[in-house]
Regions:
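Detector for small/aliphatic-rich hydrophobic stretches
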Residues: 1-82, 94, 100-109
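A contiguous pocket-lining binding segment that forms or flanks enzyme active sites
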Residues: 134-179
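Helical mechanochemical/support elements of P-loop NTPase systems and associated helical scaffolds
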Residues: 33, 64, 93, 122, ...
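Phosphate-binding/switch region of NTP-binding enzymes
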Residues: 170-212
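Conserved beta-strand segments of the P-loop GTPase G domain that flank and frequently precede/overlap
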Residues: 54, 84-85, 113-116, 139-143, ...
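Conserved inter-motif catalytic segment of the P-loop NTP-binding fold
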Residues: 79-136
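Hydrophobic/aromatic ligand-binding patch that stacks against planar heteroaromatic rings
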Residues: 74, 129, 160
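Short acidic, S/G/P-rich loop/turn micro-motifs used as interaction or catalytic elements
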Residues: 57-60, 88-90, 119, 144-149
Length: 212
């Protein structure tokens, strides 16, 4: 079985190889695709910072992940996306599906997927990835409210993002918002998705509330 040290060493090797690739965009904001919302946010969401996405309840966890992936696509047009996922998400919702990710708009070839058993390991891997200047976005998924994910941990992620230019998205399920260094905080619920012409399920839809 791969140890935590081995997993982190493998991630460091991957990030070192990525550093020889495409650098992330230098634009300070990325658009959400809605002019009214972008305007209210001063041009969109800021890159090189930490943003939190909370599921309204555990049942809405897949929607929170989908919304976070949509933000990652917006933030990262071409650079790699590092997705660090606590294994609890796989157990509850199933593993990521390549064709579904592609249908959402993210080329699976740009995705580096890291699975970790504990929240502490997720934070370590996410922090390591956030320090790599060749990464576009880091998506970190953590279940519950572990003690290791405190204000200090969020500050470390925020500072790493600011130093490297990487955008960090933290998806939280079965957790209540608490003090953090996040620039924005969202709450996500599933919404009805229906094609107006056929009445069949259409594009992914989310009910989103900007908490901060």
């Amino acid at each position: 079985m791969t140890t935590r040290r081995d997993a982190l060493a493998a991630l460091k090797g991957t990030l070192a190889r990525l550093e020889r690739g495409v650098m992330p965009s230098a634009l300070p904001h990325f658009s959400l695709g809605l002019p009214e919302l972008d305007g209210a946010l001063g041009g969109g969401l800021t890159r090189a910072s930490l943003h939190e996405v909370f599921a309204a309840s555990p049942a809405h966890g897949p929607s929170a992940t989908g919304f976070a992936l949509a933000l990652a696509i917006r933030a990262t047009p071409s650079a790699p996306v590092v997705w660090v996922r606590q294994r609890m998400f796989d157990q509850e919702f199933g593993r990521p599906y390549g064709h579904g990710i592609a249908a959402l708009g993210l080329d699976p070839g740009r995705l580096v997927l890291v699975r970790a058993r504990h929240a502490e390991d997720v934070l370590k891997a996410a922090l390591e990835a956030a320090r790599c200047t060749a990464v576009g976005t880091v998506l970190a998924e953590i279940w519950g409210s572990p003690k290791v994910l405190d204000l200090t941990a969020s500050r470390r992620l925020s500072l790493a993002a600011a130093a490297s230019g990487v955008t960090v998205l933290a998806t939280r399920v079965d957790a209540a918002p608490a003090a953090s260094a996040a620039t924005s905080r969202w709450q996500v619920r599933a919404a009805v998705s229906q094609d107006p012409q056929t009445g069949l399920p259409g594009l992914p839809a989310f009910s989103v509330t900007l908490l901060r």
